Amino acid sequence: MRKSLYLALLGSMIISTAIAGDVTGRVKYIGKPPKAKRLRMDADPVCAASHKETALAESFIVDADGNLANVIVYLNDVSFNGNPPTTPATLDQSGCIYSPHIFAVMAGQQIDILNGDKTMHNIHALPKVNKEFNKGMPKSLKKISTVFKKAEDVFVIKCDVHPWMKSYTRVFDHPYFAVTNTDGTFNISNVPDGTYEIIAWQEKFGSKRTQSQSITVKGGKATANFNFERPDRKSVV
């Protein structure tokens, strides 16, 4: 009896794995990209001295081929009954810059916030659904941890000591999301077969100008590509 139950459970696991696949794609920007702005760090000599070259804002990272980095791509309105990852996400403060600039987590997933700088920072998270917090991190404090318990749209985490320091995060109630790499590619893993709405969010375009489309995951795979482009000024009200 136990052997039969074990085989049944094993078979169920294999079937579950077989019908879950990857959603892959690439996000591009069409047109001439905006010039990256210089981050002025003169107010804190420690920050300024940590960069041999000019530090640039990361709000719009696009390569020569138009591939767009730091875009959150996710499946919308999906159900998930599993648990958040046990591996913490990491938000580092290095050279007085948040890294990663854009990231996403599951509700209930631990976030380790690191301070590798020899200067004072403070972590000021500004969610609307989850609890706002503002925690100081002197140079002697190398790590603090936090958890956002509820799903929430993108919000900013900033440093009030260094106003140029900003990171953006979104909290999901499922694991079907990714952030594009420097070549614009993304991979959302373990997606069950089915039809979904997939959405792409980019910082400068914001939540009112996301890109979306319908995809069907069949046979364990699907592809979705997105193109962001500067809107016609005449069409902007």
Task: For every predicted segment, state its role.
Residues 1-8:
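Bacterial N-terminal signal peptides that target proteins for export
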Residues 8-16:
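Bacterial N-terminal signal peptides
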Residues 20-235:
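Extracytoplasmic copper-binding redox domains, predominantly the cupredoxin/blue-copper superfamily
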